């Protein structure tokens, strides 16, 4: 005798359709397309959680570079001086790029003092 699945199949499909809520067009009504949409969204989310770390690091470096160039130095010269002065260490102790970027934006006077101190 054939078993069609009935309520189990309906529940499973309903779960996929609920995850696709907010999608446009048939992406939230058609089971097959909704399932593909949800799977692809999960792949993008997984990938971009990793890319976000790269993007923010690039942003912080750009901001630090811009702030340091106003004072006549390059980013690489500044970071080298920070490492030699033990302000930034390889094991993550001390100031990191995020902190330096925030300091350059929100408190330029303190950032300028830091640059003057380590570049001597």
Curated annotation (Swiss-Prot):
GO biological process, one term: ribosomal large subunit assembly
GO cellular component, one term: ribosome
Alphabetical keyword list: Ribonucleoprotein, Ribosomal protein, RNA-binding, rRNA-binding
SUPFAM superfamilies on file: Ribosomal protein L20 (SSF74731)
Keyword Cell membrane: no
InterPro entries: Ribosomal_bL20, RIBOSOMAL_L20_CS, Ribosomal_protein_bL20_C
Residues spanning the signal sequence: none
Pfam family, any one: Ribosomal_L20
Domain of life: Bacteria
GO molecular function list: rRNA binding; structural constituent of ribosome
Function: Binds directly to 23S ribosomal RNA and is necessary for the in vitro assembly process of the 50S ribosomal subunit. It is not involved in the protein synthesizing functions of that subunit.
Similarity field: Belongs to the bacterial ribosomal protein bL20 family.
Protein name: Large ribosomal subunit protein bL20
Origin species: Ureaplasma parvum serovar 3 (strain ATCC 700970)
